[in-house]
From Swiss-Prot:
Name of the coding gene: rplL
Pfam families: Ribosomal_L12 (PF00542), Ribosomal_L12_N (PF16320)
UniProt family annotation: Belongs to the bacterial ribosomal protein bL12 family.
Superkingdom of source: Bacteria
PANTHER family: 39S RIBOSOMAL PROTEIN L12 (PTHR45987), LARGE RIBOSOMAL SUBUNIT PROTEIN BL12M (PTHR45987:SF4)
Organism encoding this protein: Desulfitobacterium hafniense (strain Y51)
Keywords carried by this UniProt record: Ribonucleoprotein, Ribosomal protein
Entry GO terms, CC: cytosolic large ribosomal subunit
Described purpose of this protein according to its UniProt entry: Forms part of the ribosomal stalk which helps the ribosome interact with GTP-bound translation factors. Is thus essential for accurate translation.
Disulfide partners: none
Stated name of the protein: Large ribosomal subunit protein bL12
A GO molecular-function descriptor: mRNA binding
Any single GO BP term: translation
Length: 124
């Protein structure tokens, strides 16, 4: 009889309590867990629960230039490095993204500059 068959026969003869002790001994000896991995699958047609991840990249969207359009154009040029014509087209075409995929701190700083110039801004 092979070693595997002998071990299997020995395990067959154990009680439930003895098997539980054996599992604990294996976990301690080899540093493993006997817990079965849990696979979660969404049922067909069921909506998956949204994952609550913290957003790391933000888009700064100019919603409206407001009364201080010239100042907003100046700030847009400063932020983006665009030329006068391109910055004016961006401001005139609002709502449009001014900067995309920036950090939260950068997005808040850009928003503050644009709001100070008179614009309405959203950070998405």
């Amino acid at each position: 009889m092979s070693k595997t068959a002998e071990i299997l026969e020995a395990v067959k003869g154990l009680t439930v309590l003895e098997l539980a002790e054996l599992v604990k001994a294996f976990e301690e000896e080899f540093g493993v867990s006997a817990a079965a991995p849990v696979a979660v699958a969404a049922a067909p047609g069921a909506a998956a629960a949204p994952v609550a991840e913290e957003q790391t990249e933000f888009d700064v969207v100019l919603m409206n230039a407001g009364a201080g359009k010239i100042n907003v154009i100046k700030v847009v040029r400063e932020i983006t490095g665009l030329g006068l014509k391109e910055a004016k087209e961006l401001v005139d075409g609002a709502p449009k993204p001014v900067k995309e995929k920036v950090s939260k701190d950068d997005a808040e700083a850009i928003k503050a500059k644009l709001v100070e110039a008179g614009a309405t801004v959203e950070v998405k």
